[in-house]
Amino acid sequence: LWWGGMGNYVDYTKESVRNDWKQYLKDNLLSYGVTSVWNDNCEYEGLVDKDARVSFEGKGATIGQVKPVMSNLMCQLTQEAVHEEFPNTRAFAVCRSGHAGIQRYAQTWAGDNLTCWESLKYNIATILGMGLSGVANHGCDIGGFYGTAPEEELFVRWVQNGIFQPRFSIHSTNIDNTVTEPWMYSGTKHLIRDAIQFRYRLS
């Protein structure tokens, strides 16, 4: 059960499923001109039965054995589908999860982080570590994804740090019914604006 209703994980190690997934993308997104796809909830966490069987190209395996490749396959298929529909287009995919090799197919981020100073500190180390591991196109949810609205100084410092990350995204689902936005604090929005403008000057 997902927050939107019933759902299932897909076995990307089965050829017919891979073909179905690409066709699903083509019919429901790419046919409308979409060339950027955000693959989310693809880390195959929360599975009750780690011994559930998957095809693994007809050889058979458990999801526990092949879980690491699933998000990579999802993003690879996304890239393939976009290139099949738009041969001369540079596809852009975002993926919440990925393992060795994900940098070939998608941009990733440090997961749904908390709105706190500890999370900001953790994200810096995570992003640097991912870069050293070959995943250079990485970032985090600026200001935190989950929790209450970030306090003013935390938000300013997070933006000032975030402008140097490859992925810059202010993205939240605050539990206090607020939305984290660049202009949320009138006293410091000029600092946010200056930081974002500086990022654009760097590109």
Task: Place the predicted regions along the sequence by residue.
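Catalytic-domain carbohydrate-binding cleft regions of carbohydrate-active enzymes
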Residues: 1-203
